[in-house]
From Swiss-Prot:
Residues 27-137 form the sHSP domain. It holds the Pfam family HSP20. Keywords: Stress response. One of its GO terms (cellular component) is cytoplasm. Belongs to the small heat shock protein (HSP20) family. It comes from Bradyrhizobium diazoefficiens (strain JCM 10833 / BCRC 13528 / IAM 13628 / NBRC 14792 / USDA 110). This is Small heat shock protein HspE. InterPro entries: A-crystallin/Hsp20_dom, ACD_IbpA/B, HSP20-like_chaperone.
Length: 150
């Protein structure tokens, strides 16, 4: 049994605290199918990559609802093949990711057996930090005196 310490990532990622907790819980539960990566591509851009070899885009459904992203896959065997050995797993799966506040799904691409889901964090203007100008108290009174004289 492997133990992973993900605490260093908690300090360096913004907006994915709950998602990292989910990753930590997944490692503890032992459910690792399908394997996936979570990466930060820029300040407010993230990407989840799932290894889905053997699946096609038609076999996969992505649902985003509020702060939850669900990826489900079910391979439909259209042709009956006589496998001597079947090492490529195409079992049904369901992955649920809890997204942080203001994280939205931007798009999804499927290429070379990898499903890549782009996420972006769009903070509302009212919640972004802003610079506040500091006026000198004496200058404020002089300005009002000039206004009255004019």
């Amino acid at each position: 049994m492997r133990t992973y310490d993900l605490s260093p990532f908690w300090r360096s990622t913004i907006g994915f605290d709950r998602l990292l907790n989910l990753v930590n819980d997944t490692v503890d539960n032992g459910d690792t199918y399908p394997p996936y990566d979570i990466e930060r591509t820029s300040e407010d851009q993230y990407r989840i990559s799932l290894a889905l070899v053997g699946f096609t885009p038609d076999d996969v459904a992505i649902t985003a609802e509020r702060s939850t992203l669900t990826v489900e896959g079910r391979k439909t065997d259209e042709d009956e093949r006589d496998y001597l050995y079947r090492g490529i797993s195409v079992r049904p799966f369901r992955r649920v990711f809890n997204l942080a506040d203001y994280v939205q799904v931007k798009d999804a691409t499927f290429e070379d057996g990898l499903l890549k889901i782009a996420l972006t964090r769009e903070m509302p203007e009212a919640l972004k930090p802003r610079q506040i100008a500091i006026d000198v108290a004496g200058n404020d009174h002089q300005r009002s005196d000039r206004t009255q004289a004019a």
